[in-house]
Amino acid sequence: MKIISHLGPKNTYTGQATRMLAERIEEETELVDLASLEAVARSVALHEADMGVMAYYNYLEGLVQECLDLIYENDLKITGMQRLPIVLSLGAHSENHSTAEVYSHPKALAQCSGWLWDHYRDSKQIPTTSTAAAAQRVAEAKSGLAIASSEALKKYGLDLVGEDIGNKRYGRTNFTDFYLVARENGCAFDKTREYLTMVAITPHVDRPGLLAEILQQTAYHNLNNVKIHSRPALDDVAIEGLEPQMFYLEVVGHRNNDDMRRCIDSLRYKMKPEGRDIEVVRVLGSYERP
């Protein structure tokens, strides 16, 4: 049996994504909900769980900041991805809630900022660990408002005050991408399928045009960059007078593809300072493109 950890409590969007990812696994699975993304990452690293599911990217709010850093720090591998449509609703325990406090995950509050401004601009917004935790809190306290999925609100016995209240951008549906992570690579290369690979680059050199050099390597090897994220460096980088940065590149292709391998080798050569045997490029995993 494979144990899969994820952010709880039950009835979160992460829980829904976890169930969908678990259906792809041939072995029997047990799903365990934990209190934080840190707990999920550590549970896998410490062999308390075989795999974990973590929210990675929302198409309105962008990167879930701690996700990639936790994968990097705990030396985990991304083995799968699930894209989930996010449709947020507002629930309450009573009808008298015009100035009630609004509870939800910080990302959900941000994704509903326009609707909240129009209808509850004077209400205090209080962050919770998840959307389901917000629904649970309002149900137990019998006061306040919760932003969560309609399913979660109904399961906690709350009335729907507003449905599909998320911000709209160009009329597009909001999605969140979730990663399935493990201790080892688990996505075999199949030439008939399309993959994405996440690459972490920590330059131990600095010069004008450094980021352009990185992107030139992927272009030279005919690889398409889907996303690039800049974060404070997690490794000890001794570049005097600068705040060291690292880059996460999500690239179309599999880690075992010949073009990808040549690109990784080139990046390691160009980003590594002369005379120092240190890691500058790490492949965080390959996974099927949704």
Residue ranges and their predicted role:
Residues 1-290:
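Domain-level signature for soluble enzymes in the chorismate/prephenate branch of the shikimate pathway
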